Amino acid sequence: MSGQSAFSLEDRRSSFGLNSFALKCIALITMIIDHVGAILYPEVGGLRIIGRIAFPIYAFLVTEGFYHTKNVKKYMLRLLLFAIVSEIPFDLALTGQILEFGHQNVFFTLFAGLLLMELYSRQTSSAGRLICILAVTTLGDLIRSDYGAWGILIIFCFYVFRENIWLKMLVVSGIHIFAFGSVQSFAVLACIPIALYNGEKGANIKYAFYGIYPLHLLVLYMIKQAM
């Protein structure tokens, strides 16, 4: 990406800030709180408000992962694999059915966002780039991935405006407020930890973070069955 922002990643590298591991922890905790609310206590709206913080952070981290991974294809395959593995736990926890195709888990959205960045980066023409955006976002809506086309566009906005922290925060916040509205507007709170990102990696236990997603859904499903 060309251009310089007032505050680049290098400028924000300091002892004060959040590394990638810390952001993952925040996203994970807020996601679990959100799912506790959605699955066990839907009447407690505050849990869902806290949970709105999770997706923008995951979207941001996928964009950073795209830039830092040594192998984008393996990264995409990993996201797709966990999307498939997580679908039954996701459907059981949210609908009580083994497979329900009306709503797919967020790993499909993250995969689609990564796919869009990879395809877009390979295009040299405006027409080719536009086709990539339309094709992948349409795919997201067709398979009914979590957050749909807008979720994919949020990931893409973090990619396009990566070097301008204020612009990407403004655009992503605008999407959450105007495209989703209501409770989802509280996703703008995710801008705070994202703005504190210092560009550093931190502890590397990515498979643990991936594995917790289907496992916590299964645990919540079993708790719901026992209640």
Predicted features by range, described:
Residues M1-M227:
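Alpha-helical transmembrane segments and their immediate juxtamembrane cytosolic regions
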